[in-house]
């Protein structure tokens, strides 16, 4: 929730910078679809939006009462300006001639400005390295991470045509804000730093694992287990492979190093769920997305440490198992209808329950839990 609130605050700041305003007619359009390149056009229309261009759809009310034509574009009373306008309601719509943009990598962007400062929100699909050129002038270039709560100077270079080239590395399915700051509250450019000394320690001691269903489920949960790995492939027990609920995993490890500048617990990957981490009784936060890494520097201590990880997955596996059981033996109750055969139609698959042939999905933590300590700070905190 905090991540979403921070993103929405920045995405509500200033005014949007958009490329295209499209009038799609007065018919209620169902949806806009896209391929793996994100922007493809409107269902039933031959319009295809070139990659790298942002667009909004405007209706007749906007065109008649709010929008004003400015050259080839539109301007709205709230300050939003669209450089190009196109009527795509015709049977053979024609877009204005748009310069081709060099867009590389599976990512999307949103641009907002207040006239002095500019904010670009970048989100990737898979691993993505984003490189883009912007006229920054004398402004500083910063990376704001709404997930890690960090703010640091970006890596940039000047191009031959007087623009600023910014390179941003995004984690798997991750995001970042690139801020061109023209105010007094700036982050100083990165100085040449001493190489950080990373140390990695795998937490190899066994885990005591307890299982719990949601309080509404009255069935008895699986008994306590001792595991070396926290992935469900480490067991062949039918009841555990289809478990849906919360696993409380407790282990210990010894740390003999000096007090680090930074310390992270790397969970590798949490399948089909989230992980809440406590170190020595200190709440270190919730890992719910890549890079599945939490800051534990304030909780880590020399000597013996206790770690507790509460892993909660979705109901999917239990629902798949229950559709294979007689109704009297099912743990869950669902308003969805179960099916005996695989469903070929994709809308049926989305809007119905599971079938007996559906495969379970992985759960738990993939790989070893690793403690990463850093002797020199990787980035300034603010």
Regions found by a protein language model. Name each.
Residues 175-176, 263, 302-328:
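Short, well-structured beta-strand segments enriched in hydrophobic/aromatic residues
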Residues 1-246, 254-258, 277, 287, ...:
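Carbohydrate-binding surfaces of carbohydrate-active enzymes
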């Amino acid at each position: 929730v905090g991540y979403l609130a921070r993103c929405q605050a920045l995405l509500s700041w200033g005014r949007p910078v958009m490329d295209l305003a499209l009038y799609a007619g007065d018919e209620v359009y169902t949806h806009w679809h896209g391929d793996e390149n994100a922007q493809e056009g409107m269902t039933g229309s031959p319009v295809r939006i070139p990659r790298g261009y942002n667009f909004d759809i405007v209706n007749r009310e906007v065109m008649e009462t709010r929008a004003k034509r400015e050259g080839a574009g539109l301007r709205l009373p709230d300050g939003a300006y669209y450089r190009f306008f196109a009527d795509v309601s015709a049977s053979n719509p024609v877009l204005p001639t748009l310069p081709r943009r060099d867009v590389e990598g599976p990512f999307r962007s949103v641009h907002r400005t207040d006239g002095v400062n500019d904010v670009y929100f970048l989100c990737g699909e898979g691993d993505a390295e984003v490189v883009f050129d912007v006229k920054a002038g004398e402004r500083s270039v910063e990376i704001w991470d709404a997930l890690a709560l960090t703010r640091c100077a970006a890596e940039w270079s000047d191009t031959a045509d007087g623009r600023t080239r910014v390179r941003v590395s995004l984690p798997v399915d991750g995001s970042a804000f690139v801020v061109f700051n023209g105010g007094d509250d700036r982050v100083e450019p990165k100085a040449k730093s001493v190489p950080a000394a990373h140390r990695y320690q795998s937490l190899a001691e066994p885990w005591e694992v307890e299982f719990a269903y949601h309080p509404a489920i009255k069935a008895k949960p699986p008994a306590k287990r001792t595991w070396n790995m926290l992935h469900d492939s480490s067991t062949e027990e039918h009841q555990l492979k289809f478990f849906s609920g919360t696993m409380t995993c407790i282990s210990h490890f010894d740390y003999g190093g000096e007090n680090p500048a930074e310390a992270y617990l790397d969970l590798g990957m949490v399948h089909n769920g989230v992980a809440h981490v406590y170190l020595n009784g200190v709440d270190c936060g919730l890992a719910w997305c890549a890079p599945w890494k939490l800051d534990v520097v304030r909780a880590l201590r020399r000597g013996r440490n206790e770690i507790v990880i509460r892993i909660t997955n979705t109901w999917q596996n239990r629902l798949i198992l229950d559709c294979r059981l007689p109704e009297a033996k099912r743990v869950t109750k669902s308003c969805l209808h179960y099916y005996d055969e695989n469903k070929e139609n994709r809308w049926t698959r989305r809007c119905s329950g599971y079938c007996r042939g559906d495969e379970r999905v992985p759960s738990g933590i993939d790989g070893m839990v690793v403690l990463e300590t850093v002797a020199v700070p990787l980035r300034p905190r603010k």
